[in-house]
């Protein structure tokens, strides 16, 4: 399912009842919890969150942890942005406005001081410099998938933040909380979609860092890549489009090849990054 998050529960239920594999791109926490509960009695694979974040970023973050004897911090960052921004929002809605608004409004899961908790979205601002370009990052919901469940009690810090051009988060807070548009999501969606239509030239930034101890020495591992539009079989794909689609298709290829479990709920962090990259579609990320 590539449908908006609020349509996925009945589709997942139908897949469960019919015993067929299910994959989606949802970032919605409650939808994922619903599907996770279905997984206990599923005779086929139920794999939500197969996009970028949640999805690929969790696979990458988990892969970095294998270098450590003990993990201290896991910090994951993803941004899908116009390559040539304009206006104060400096953004373009190249994916579901429903999803963007949902992840800006809902609280985000995180682990802080070893404890799993919920933190407000559009908070925790930090500034990032990527190859000389300044960005901001702030908390948004859903990006960690099931990682908080996996690492609760095992790490001091685990968080996910969305990368944006500076000033974007403050303006979104103004729209949602000062103008109270958080209570009228349909109007907010219309305003944003009309003001910031999709662009052809976009970029996806993927950044993950893990800190911990190797042989009693504190060290740090990082992954960073910027993905741009590419041509696939004669058709140009936006960066957000092909990276999202390829993340999902690579997981399908792994299930079809028997590399992954054939039934039950599938966590993204259970997918080996090396095997992911070895699939025909996953190889696009090399």
Where are these regions (language model features)?
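Adenosine-phosphate binding glycine-rich loop
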Residues: 42-82
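Rossmann-like NAD(P)-binding element
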Residues: 1-8
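Glycine-rich, histidine-containing beta strand-loop boundary motifs that form or position
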Residues: 3, 26-27, 50, 78
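Short gly/pro/ser/thr-enriched loop/turn and capping motifs at secondary-structure boundaries
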Residues: 8, 29-33, 52-56, 81-84
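Rossmann-fold NAD(P)-binding glycine/threonine-rich loop
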Residues: 10-13, 17, 21, 25-48
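Alpha-helix N-cap/helix-initiation motif
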Residues: 4, 50, 237-241
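C-terminal catalytic/substrate-binding lobe primarily of soluble NAD(P)-dependent oxidoreductases
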Residues: 66-286
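Short amphipathic alpha-helical segments and helix-helix/interface helices
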Residues: 12, 35-37, 61-65, 148, ...
């Amino acid at each position: 399912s590539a449908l908006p998050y609020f349509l996925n529960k009945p589709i997942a239920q139908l897949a469960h009842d019919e015993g067929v594999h299910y994959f989606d791109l949802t970032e919605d926490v409650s939808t994922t919890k619903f599907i996770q509960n279905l997984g206990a009695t599923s005779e086929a694979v139920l794999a939500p969150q197969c996009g970028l974040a949640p999805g690929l970023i969790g696979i990458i973050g988990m892969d970095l942890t294998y270098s450590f004897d003990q993990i201290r911090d896991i910090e994951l960052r993803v941004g899908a942005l116009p390559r040539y921004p304009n206006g104060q929002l400096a953004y373009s809605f190249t994916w579901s406005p429903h999803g963007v608004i949902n992840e800006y409004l809902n609280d985000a899961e995180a682990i802080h001081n070893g404890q799993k908790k919920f933190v407000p979205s559009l908070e925790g601002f930090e500034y990032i410099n990527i190859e000389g370009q300044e960005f901001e990052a702030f908390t948004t919901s859903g990006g960690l998938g099931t990682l908080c469940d996996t690492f609760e009690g095992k790490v001091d810090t685990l968080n996910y933040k969305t990368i944006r051009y500076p000033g974007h988060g403050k303006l979104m807070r103004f729209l949602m909380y000062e103008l109270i548009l958080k209570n009228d999501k349909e109007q907010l969606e219309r305003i944003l979609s009309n003001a910031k239509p999709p662009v052809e030239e976009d970029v996806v930034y993927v950044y993950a860092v893990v800190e911990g101890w190797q042989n009693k020495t504190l060290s740090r591992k990082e992954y960073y890549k910027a993905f741009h539009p590419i041509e696939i079989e004669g058709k140009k794909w936006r960066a957000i489009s092909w990276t999202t689609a390829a993340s999902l298709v690579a997981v399908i290829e792994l299930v079809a090849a028997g590399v992954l479990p054939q039934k039950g709920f599938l966590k993204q962090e259970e997918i080996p990054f090396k095997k992911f990259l070895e699939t025909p579609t996953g190889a696009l990320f090399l």
